[in-house]
């Protein structure tokens, strides 16, 4: 049975490993560590005593922004991202958050998950994300009313 708990200081090496595997242009370890604190709701997904995913979300008043969500590739496509996202949304709602924002690469297959969970496309940021080959890719800005 998967567990969802708050991220702790000792989790960062594993989070960084997942980040490197799961994203086209991953965050650095420093960026992961810098996105922590009282304005954040950061969760880890544990299965069989191992962290297999995480979400990093910043809250400001009644809005939140999901900065990063990642599931280890071996566990993708099994509903784990949906489970983590649903728990995050539930905890945000309990804290009085009304709107959850995110941006996602146009090519990211997770877009279907966000749409299925109630997110709507709000805007396109042209040439926002870098690609490994030196090019750029659009970001899709999405919002969900909790």
PLM segments and residue spans:
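Conserved N-terminal entry element of GNAT/NAT acetyltransferase domains
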Residues: 1-10, 140, 144-146
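Acetyl-CoA-dependent GNAT
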Residues: 9-74, 85-87, 91, 95, ...
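Short hydrophobic/aromatic beta-strand or adjacent loop that forms the aromatic wall/cage
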Residues: 40-42, 136-141
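Conserved acetyl-CoA-binding loop-helix of GNAT-fold acetyltransferases
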Residues: 77-90, 112-116
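Acyl-donor (CoA/ACP) binding surface of acyl/acetyltransferases
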Residues: 78, 82, 126-128, 138-139, ...
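Short glycine/proline-centered loop/turn elements that form peptide/ligand docking sites
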Residues: 81, 85, 107-110, 127-133
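N-terminal beta-strand motif that seeds the catalytic metal site of vicinal oxygen chelate
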Residues: 96, 103-105
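Conserved catalytic-core motifs of GNAT/GCN5-like acyltransferases
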Residues: 101-103, 115, 120-138
